[in-house]
Amino acid sequence: MSFRMNRYALRGAFSGIVAFLAVVAFAQPPAGYYNSAEGLSGQPLRIALHNIIDGHTSITYAQLWSAFQSTDAKPGNKVWDMYSDIPSGTPPYVYTFGTDQCGGYNSEGDCYNREHSFPQSWFNGDSPMYTDLFHLYPTDGFVNNKRDNFPYGNVGSADWTSQNGSKLGLCLDPGYNGTVFEPIDAYKGDFARSYFYMMTRYYGEMSGWPAPVVQNGDLIPWEMAVMVQWNDLDPVSPKESARNNAVYAIQHNRNPYIDRPEWVHAIWGAILGVPENAGPEMSLQSNASGLHVERGTAAAGTLFVYDMAGRTLLTSPISSGRSYIAFSAPDGIYLAEVISPDGRSVQRFVW
């Protein structure tokens, strides 16, 4: 890495994420679809969105196979499997609709099945959640089985890694130390917005669900923080927007967080008690080999460093006070985020 005289940190509020990782809304909801939600925030917004998307048209479990052909299709009648796809490269295997549908499987690449990203055991397998396409995806059967009913989260040291880089292992996120499943960075936002859809479509119905990540009708704090982070760092893609439109054609409702991803913060920023521009004071400086992070008396947490595409480049535990973290990257602008029990702090920096 060449020496540069003007390496410096750019202090910024959390609201800068929106501009820094700008989300372009490709999906086009019908005119007036969200009129009753405009101008609201917090729980009133969530309730208004619930009333808009409630009562969707349900399909049968068997009909999911054909539905996937319009919601999750690549060119050539191929399955868009987020547990095996590699957007920036060549996937290890690609399934054909119908031909490669599970049956049985013994390893990755055998067949695809129906993945409840929000596991069915978490809502007792009840309808209409059981066939709600906004959280159901076609995925490799073997990887689906490995994921099992584990929550989504950020993995520290992986116990198992799929061929596209999805991981299973102990959770790195503050507040939980069990096993989690981590999809690749390119699809984290897709799954996060699926979860926020579930928290909105089934608002008022979740209090009796045995979901380990749901408490008092909402995501528990550690999982909520992960989902908010993933929503921010993997912006809505044309693929996700096209899927929103395809599901709308079948179910006659939409995922509002694909159409308007900023509504995640408008609702759950307040629930988390973390306004967009708040968090423990953080000062970050870089040198030739790493990052010096000063956080005063803030609690220990986890440092994440992202590039402008939202890819995670570094995940590291961080202590209170002053920490030094080894880091190296090409010249450019990066985003540092610290999540701790105190909240989250975000700062852009030039490397």
Place the predicted regions along the sequence by residue.
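C-terminal outer-membrane/trafficking sorting elements
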Residues: 277-351
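N-terminal module-boundary/linker segments of secreted carbohydrate-active enzymes
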Residues: 27-89
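Bacterial Sec-dependent N-terminal signal peptides
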Residues: 1-31
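Short clusters of hydrophobic/aromatic residues that line enzyme substrate/ligand-binding pockets
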Residues: 82, 257, 274, 301
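Short, His- and charge-rich active-site/binding loops that engage polyanionic ligands
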Residues: 86-111
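Short, flexible beta-strand-to-coil junctions
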Residues: 83-89, 199-201, 338-340
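Domain-level detector of nuclease and nuclease-like folds
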Residues: 102-113, 117-270
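Low-complexity, Pro/Thr/Ser/Gly/Ala-rich linker/spacer regions in secreted
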Residues: 28-30, 268-280
